[in-house]
Amino acid sequence: MRSLLRPLGILFLFCAPLFAAAQDTSKEKAAMQKMYVDFLTEEGYRPEIDSDGDVQFKAEGRTYFINVVEDDPTYFRVVLANIWPIESEDERVQCLVAVDYSNAKAKVTKSYLVKDNIWVGIETFIPEAEDFKKIFKRCMSALNNGVTHFVSKMKEQQGN
């Protein structure tokens, strides 16, 4: 029995700091989630925490999410996922052209393929985590502008 306790004790000594760090990370993530949820609620949105721990909200019939990155609180990312399903290889090529066009034309946004769909997001660094409040409306406007550029290029290619 004694021979088993010693290795377990040593294992505990090495693992205890990892458990403490995980708890600190969850506290940081919860604090960031609360900050985003409180702000969005004040702005009239109805935010929820999604299964990944990100903050999801709807605006004008679209579902957005704010990526919660607890180990980099001054990184701010808001995403509109699944704006255009890719239904064929020909359409995939058109999407790549439209993504390139949108990325070249729209300020700050990134359009990209995720599996068989198009996502558009904003990624930026801010001095303090709370500073996202100062740029949120402009980010949403820019994000929607990126979507508009993507969709217009897709429609142009499809003859609409």
What is the predicted function of each stretch?
Residues 1-9:
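Bacterial N-terminal signal peptides that target proteins for export
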Residues 43-47, 59, 103-106, 147-154, ...:
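Sec/Tat-exported extracytoplasmic proteins
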Residues 80-121:
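Short, internal acidic amphipathic alpha-helical interface segments
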Residues 23-27, 82-86, 126-136, 140:
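Second-shell loop/turn segments in exported
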Residues 129-160:
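C-terminal partner/receptor-binding element of secreted or periplasmic proteins
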Residues 12-21:
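Hydrophobic h-region of N-terminal signal peptides that target proteins for export
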Residues 22-75:
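N-terminal secretory signal peptides
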Residues 33, 37, 96, 133, ...:
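Extracytoplasmic/secreted envelope proteins and their assembly/folding machinery
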